[in-house]
């Protein structure tokens, strides 16, 4: 029973910590550094996420083709064709994301 009496005190303490940490976070985000850090994090997440999605799609496509078709394509394509496709699609995705980065950088312009 004494344990139950300490729960409101524990909840009050955790609430105080949460509000304090949230306040520090908001003061940090009000500064320009917070905005830049969030933009860079989102940019890196876009690059990594889009690249992993494209590689996943390519591996799913190659797994769902009929075996006769796969054997016929393997006679024509070199052994390193799939990694080359990965690189080409990754570069295309990176170019798209760098265009998005330019928009983010123009949003983070210091003169605004």
Swiss-Prot record:
<dbReference type="GO" id="GO:0033644">
    <property type="term" value="C:host cell membrane"/>
</dbReference>
<keyword id="KW-0472">Membrane</keyword>
<keyword id="KW-0946">Virion</keyword>
<keyword id="KW-1162">Viral penetration into host cytoplasm</keyword>
<dbReference type="GO" id="GO:0044423">
    <property type="term" value="C:virion component"/>
</dbReference>
<dbReference type="InterPro" id="IPR035210">
    <property type="entry name" value="DUF5455"/>
</dbReference>
<keyword id="KW-0812">Transmembrane</keyword>
<feature type="transmembrane region" description="Helical">
    <location>
        <begin position="36"/>
        <end position="56"/>
    </location>
</feature>
<comment type="function">
    <text>Plays essential roles both in the entry of the viral genome into the bacterial host and in budding process. The formation of the G3P-G6P complex termed adsorption complex is essential for correct termination of filamentous phage assembly.</text>
</comment>
<dbReference type="Pfam" id="PF17537">
    <property type="entry name" value="DUF5455"/>
</dbReference>
<feature type="transmembrane region" description="Helical">
    <location>
        <begin position="80"/>
        <end position="100"/>
    </location>
</feature>
<comment type="subunit">
    <text>Interacts with G3P; this interaction is required for proper integration of G3P and G6P into the virion.</text>
</comment>
<protein>
    <recommendedName>
        <fullName>Head virion protein G6P</fullName>
    </recommendedName>
</protein>
<dbReference type="GO" id="GO:0016020">
    <property type="term" value="C:membrane"/>
</dbReference>
<dbReference type="GO" id="GO:0046718">
    <property type="term" value="P:symbiont entry into host cell"/>
</dbReference>
<feature type="transmembrane region" description="Helical">
    <location>
        <begin position="3"/>
        <end position="23"/>
    </location>
</feature>
<keyword id="KW-1133">Transmembrane helix</keyword>
<keyword id="KW-1160">Virus entry into host cell</keyword>
<keyword id="KW-1241">Viral penetration into host cytoplasm via pilus retraction</keyword>
<keyword id="KW-1043">Host membrane</keyword>
<comment type="similarity">
    <text>Belongs to the inovirus G6P protein family.</text>
</comment>
